[in-house]
Amino acid sequence: MRSGWRRSRRRLALVAAAVALVAVVGLTLFAAYGGRPSGPVVRVTVPSGATFRVAADSLGRAGLVASPSLFRWYARLTGRDRDIKAGTYLLQHGRSWNSLVNALRAGQGLERRLTIPEGWSLREIVPALARVLDVPVDSVRAAVRDTALVHELDLPTPTLEGYLFPDTYSFAYNTTPRAAVRDMVERFEAVWQPDWTERLQQLAMSRNDIVALASIVEKEAVLPEERPVISAVYHNRLRLGMPLQADPTVQYAIGEHHEHVTFKDLAVQSPYNTYRHPGLPPGPIASPGRASIEAALYPASVPYLYFVARPDGHHEFRTTFKEHTEAKEQIRHAQQPRR
């Protein structure tokens, strides 16, 4: 009887081992290949110094794994429950356990954040976006000049200058320059209001005209309350057929920022030089924020045609050239050292 009992125990052990092996193989195959990314992308934060248990629990709370304990067991079984990368991840529902473990260990999916300040042009945006996406600058430059993408986004300019809305963006791992640029233009479209389109008809201006004007206002204004007044100066000049004579357009044309625009700068041959060419420039010179767009659409009701900057960022606004000349002289005199 003892030999039969021993044989039964041996059979049971073999069956249990076989079941365990099947379970392990099945779990491994499911973890490696089961599930396809689908559904929303969620943000998961893995604190610095966190254990794999903490990371697994975070994935569980986000609904990315149904059983954090089994997920930990799978990672331990495959020898990959160490050396995870801390940070904030953007991960899509439906990913396999294998891909999630790989993401945690390699930092794949780590959120990449970029803040575009108001008034930045493509000269600043392109290298900043390239650094965040970890791609060559030329690939981002190609994306913003992609005529097919510009046409697809229904924009009336050869590049995306002015339409990459200034804001803070979160990009997932492996986001392409084209996808990032599209997100930024879509943010612009989301900010643009239907009543602004109606306002264009009242002003007899195109949206590109307004964005171009708003970009100049953005570069000129230091104080928020002066934006509508600066806008009014340019609207008044346009109405009277006067050249805008906006220094930021000259700086854009020469590709450099000078503290003071020189006579040599003013002579630059460019359609963006509003000293030499009447009317608005061909397109925006920077990315304006919402406040500057609103100022371009709704200028203050003032008669001013001139303004000059004071050292503290304020501007002196005047109606006649004589008054403007006097204001400049007063500012120059005030800056001279007293004896």
Positions of predicted regions on the chain:
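Pocket-edge positions in alpha/beta enzyme catalytic cores
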Residues: 16-18, 44-47, 92, 202, ...
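Signal peptide-directed extracytoplasmic domains
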Residues: 30-192
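Alpha-helical interaction segments
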Residues: 20-23, 79, 262, 314
